[in-house]
Amino acid sequence: MIGLLLVLSFSGCIDFGSEETKVLKIFHAGSLAVPFEEYEKMYEEQNKNVDVQREAAGSVACVRKITDLNRNAHVLASADYKVIPEMMMPEYADWYVMVSKNEIVIAYTEMSKYNNEINGENWYEIFKRDGVKYGFSSPNDDPCGYRTQMIIQLSELYYNDSTIYDELILANTNFKVDENDDGTYLIRSPKSITVNEERVFLRSKEVDLLGPLQAYAYDYLFIYKSVADQHGLKYVELPNEINLGDYKSEEFYSKVSITLEGQNATYMATPIVYGLTVPKNAEDRDLGISFVKLVLNHPEVFENAGQPAINPAIGVGNVPDELKSLVTMG
């Protein structure tokens, strides 16, 4: 009996003095890689028994890991907050917070054709020239991809040139576009995208396009401004009316929408806003909430990464009590 008590006492001492390492899994947009690397370091410094593991992908692909593949994540961070209410709520999420903003630019290198001529007013004319190759991510996987399509279609309205989308996209891909009687446009992204590879460079998400651009595989890339800054790329800034970074232009943006035909999902062009949530099927929701709380407490991380923070963040839905004091309910 004494021996048994000693064994039990010894075992209890080991359990009391040890902490089990927990894994905090995050699915996030590729354009959030830089700020979330910093958030990971901050969180692990404050929580020594937690290993933060991040998976970067296009935001739509991130959501589908949860909704279609039933994978577990403690935090979902999207480059387009709207994929949360439109693809996850109410079954997979019941709240989200809007945390930062961005805009689209056209990145290039010193080897890009006509880089000494291109600007925010003539870029589409440069793209039409022989031998120029431009890249964008897949609309079916990545908000940056469908935002690129929106920008090119909006350009027809802004520059008063009805040939821009036709010559840059319709002539080189299997996308379609419908012009409605009210002057709005609906782009149709097919389930299986094909492109003219002599003119268009396509990859799943925008960060997959950076290496090939820097290796001079093509000339120009539609990319988030923050990502271009983080990677030291040269870029052309687009007018506010088409760069999707200006709240004041929201009404103009709304003239263009895109349908992802393989997903039965439609998105209207809106200002670029990033969103976070903790999925309902997360194995440890408190763990995810604690990470979101860190993000909300440190908006300067977004600012340092070139992504203007929304401070305080805007909360929508059944925001957890632990976060309510850090957000403005929208």
From Swiss-Prot:
InterPro entries, sorted: ABC_trnspt_W-bd_WtpA (IPR022498), ModA/WtpA (IPR050682)
GO terms, molecular function: molybdate ion binding; tungstate binding
Signal peptide: 1-13
GO biological process: molybdate ion transport
Disulfide bonds: none
Alphabetically ordered keywords of this record: Signal
A family per Pfam: SBP_bac_11
Domain of life: Archaea
Family: Belongs to the bacterial solute-binding protein 1 family. WtpA subfamily.
PANTHER family: MOLYBDATE-BINDING PERIPLASMIC PROTEIN, MOLYBDATE_TUNGSTATE-BINDING PROTEIN WTPA
Name under which the protein is recorded: Uncharacterized solute-binding protein Mevan_0954
Species: Methanococcus vannielii (strain ATCC 35089 / DSM 1224 / JCM 13029 / OCM 148 / SB)
